[in-house]
């Protein structure tokens, strides 16, 4: 029972819509009505500005990061293969990612999983996250598309999990990559049409 409570708590924390709340609280804006209509960090930068964008990014990363440690902090006990699987920090973090993408608070219309996924990876393997961040910024520097850099970094996480032979990370990163690609399908279409906005600060 406690494992179910832990996973539900992880989902609800992940579902906290940082961009939406900050937009409403400090700017009196519904971020869903501007830019890409997304509640995540990238659209927060576009609509609310850099300070708010950085705050949303931090909060979204933190959501994923903190949930990884729930199995250590909460009184959960694994007494079999199934309970052991669901008390793995990566699996608990996956529920936070699902909450971020499909938040119950906003009729299941949330962000695109990038920052919260980064928080989960930070919690389980900071060195891998550093490598992925370097790849992200290299791709971003070359092509100027946040969406493309995010997808490439996600795919590299799958490859990295194979290299280090972390098979739970492999499963989670593969699922997240699928979600991320699906959530970015409109961005991908705009890239092919030459209509996707490029960043100007790099």
Curated annotation (Swiss-Prot):
GO terms under cellular component: plasma membrane
Stored SMART domains: G3P_acyltransf (SM01207)
Pfam families according to UniProt: G3P_acyltransf (PF02660)
Keyword GTP-binding included in the entry's annotation: no
Example GO BP: phospholipid biosynthetic process
Compartments where found: Cell membrane
Pathway entry: Lipid metabolism; phospholipid metabolism
EC category name: transferase
Transmembrane segments: 2-22, 54-74, 85-105, 120-140, 141-161, 162-182
Alphabetical UniProt keywords: Cell membrane, Lipid biosynthesis, Lipid metabolism, Membrane, Phospholipid biosynthesis, Phospholipid metabolism, Transferase, Transmembrane, Transmembrane helix
Membrane topology field: Multi-pass membrane protein
EC number: 2.3.1.275
Keyword Translocase: no
Catalytic activity: an acyl phosphate + sn-glycerol 3-phosphate = a 1-acyl-sn-glycero-3-phosphate + phosphate
NCBIfam families assigned: glycerol-3-phosphate 1-O-acyltransferase PlsY
Annotated HAMAP family: PlsY
Subunit note: Probably interacts with PlsX.
Function: Catalyzes the transfer of an acyl group from acyl-phosphate (acyl-PO(4)) to glycerol-3-phosphate (G3P) to form lysophosphatidic acid (LPA). This enzyme utilizes acyl-phosphate as fatty acyl donor, but not acyl-CoA or acyl-ACP.
Protein family according to the UniProt entry: Belongs to the PlsY family.
Name recorded for this polypeptide: Glycerol-3-phosphate acyltransferase
Lineage of producing organism: Bacteria, Bacillati, Bacillota, Bacilli, Bacillales
Gene for this chain: plsY
